[in-house]
Amino acid sequence: MLLALDIGNTNVTLGLVHGETIMAARRATTKAASTPDELEVLIDGLLRLDGASMADVTGISLASVVPTLTGVATAMAERRGVQLMVAGPGNMPMPIRVQRSVEVGADRLVNAVAVARLYGTPAIVVDFGTATTFDCVSRDGAYVGGAITPGIELGLEALASRTARLPRIELQEPPKAIGTDTVSAMQSGVVLGYRALTLGLLESIRTELARTEKVDPGNIQVVLTGGLSVAPWARKLPGVDAIDPELTLKGLAILWALASGEPIVPGDTAAGWTGSAAGSIHIISEAAK
């Protein structure tokens, strides 16, 4: 089976791909100092929570924003003798219209591929992670840029670690904006403030994308993803068309299917992709069998 593996700065997210289904989707804390052995133990342990194991993995589709762990994952795949595809700007099946494509995180590009394939274009993906990213896809299916803000948990951590008397608090939406104690005041500033930031930036981006693409703002697909996309405060955001916490994993599955020529959905093939040729995606590491 294919293992979709997303290595972020905060979390490692993975899932086994079976047809159109992401199975055994799990998250764990990223440990940048991991060895190939430690990464394999982590992945195997997560898969075993759902009755699977590394023995079931025949290929790995990887998006990583941690360069050291990209190398660790490559070494792990080579030792196990499984194919590895590393997503990056050089093997995306869509035009990338930004000044320096090499600076765009692999997860952001994978999200763009997934949203275009699964939800249509033009589109905006909002990914709530260590950073919150806003990524835009044009009407003709090109990645055209976006925005990056500190993630909500990063802001909360900064408040607690950089001040003498502010405590660490739970990310919970307060009943009102005016807090009557330290905890409720912090919850108001962090949760309600972050929601306002997200809404304001999303509205600006949607308006600008609609203008450049000559479409009505209401015709732009807005999809939330990331672990916090299912948080109560995020689920209440207006103007959102879908919440898809596994969007990145689905994008990795799509990229693998395009690279291998396998059907993405029943009756579909890589040749049906409305972007660059599937052959532009290559397996960058394939251990000898």
Predicted regions and their residues:
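Short glycine-aspartate micro-motif
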Residues: 2-6, 59-61, 123-127, 221-223
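Short glycine-rich, Thr/Ser-proximal phosphate-binding strand/loop in the N-terminal lobe
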Residues: 2-45, 141-167, 173, 184
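Phosphate/pyrophosphate-binding loops at sites that engage ATP/ADP/AMP, CoA/4′-phosphopantetheine
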Residues: 43-58, 201-218
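Short glycine-rich phosphate-binding loop at a beta-alpha junction
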Residues: 54-65, 83-85, 213-227
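Phosphate-binding/catalytic loop of phosphoryl-transfer enzymes
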Residues: 74, 82-162, 191-206, 288
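Conserved phosphate-binding/catalytic loops in two-lobed NTP-binding clefts
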Residues: 81-93, 237-253
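A mobile "lid/hinge" subdomain adjacent to the ATP/sugar-phosphate binding pocket shared
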Residues: 160-192, 220-221, 226-232
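Glycine-rich phosphate-binding/hydrolytic loop that grips phosphoryl groups
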Residues: 241-289
